[in-house]
């Protein structure tokens, strides 16, 4: 009886250290380039390599499990995984987060960049969901300022998605010379719902969406974007987004976090990407996060935008059917894994 009790305490101690002290992740396999890939192994600074595929993401403890799944899915489906360079933006605990990444992906090419939360916090207005108010959710606004000036193009990815196709196809999206970013557009969405009656009733504001636009403004999801960083810097687009955020602090013109300023600046002026690259909304709406089905058509990227995240629903024992597609990319060690180790 005494020995069983000691064994129980030992197992409990393992759980306490591993789960209360932080999540523990498995090491991912190493992935190798196909023979036709150019090599960046000999580049003095892979961070600036023009032969690399550059991916930008945010990294924090709340979404770390999702971020690890994104990384694995990108590498697993890439024909040139050794040519992918990740650029992680983080607001705090960067050393701890770096250790997690290195432990699971020892061969990953990446760099971590600090993000000044204090500089953005005063510009954030409350939205319909608290997760949308996180300062790190606004880091995409500042990528051109945070990342090295040697970078000309980057794919930005949220932490609640997985790829099931080669990211090089997305990275090589054609972007016209007078366009700054590319993303899947959804012109059947009711664009008016993204802004308040105050916005639409003020002609000096609402006319913004009809001035200097290449096409009719349409909704696009900012969780998957191909961004031309040099064009962004040349056009001073960070300042343009900040101006709308400053106005929002004085007059409430939208409700949905970091998305509306992007729409105000870029909608109608983006390069469209095939919808297969953002099967979004799998997290349900922003209030209940109910289960949803895939949109019709082929799929290259699954995106759990909305309130419901697959890892949360799985842990709660209430997964949606499509959450099963996320599970193979989950690197979190189960309690069984921990006991066996």
Swiss-Prot record:
Its EC number is 2.4.1.-. Pfam families: Glyco_transf_8. SUPFAM superfamilies: Nucleotide-diphospho-sugar transferases (SSF53448). The keyword Cell membrane does not apply. Pathway: Glycan metabolism; pectin biosynthesis. Keywords: Cell wall biogenesis/degradation, Glycoprotein, Glycosyltransferase, Golgi apparatus, Membrane, Signal-anchor, Transferase, Transmembrane, Transmembrane helix. One of its GO terms (molecular function) is polygalacturonate 4-alpha-galacturonosyltransferase activity. It is found in: Golgi apparatus membrane. Residues 23-341 are lumenal. The keyword Transmembrane helix applies. Glycans are attached at residue 190. One of its GO terms (cellular component) is Golgi membrane. Residues 1-4 are cytoplasmic. It is a single-pass type II membrane protein. GO terms for biological process: cell wall organization; pectin biosynthetic process. The chain crosses the membrane at residues 5-22. Belongs to the glycosyltransferase 8 family. May be involved in pectin and/or xylans biosynthesis in cell walls. This is Probable galacturonosyltransferase-like 2. It comes from Arabidopsis thaliana. The lineage of its organism: Eukaryota, Viridiplantae, Streptophyta, Embryophyta, Tracheophyta.
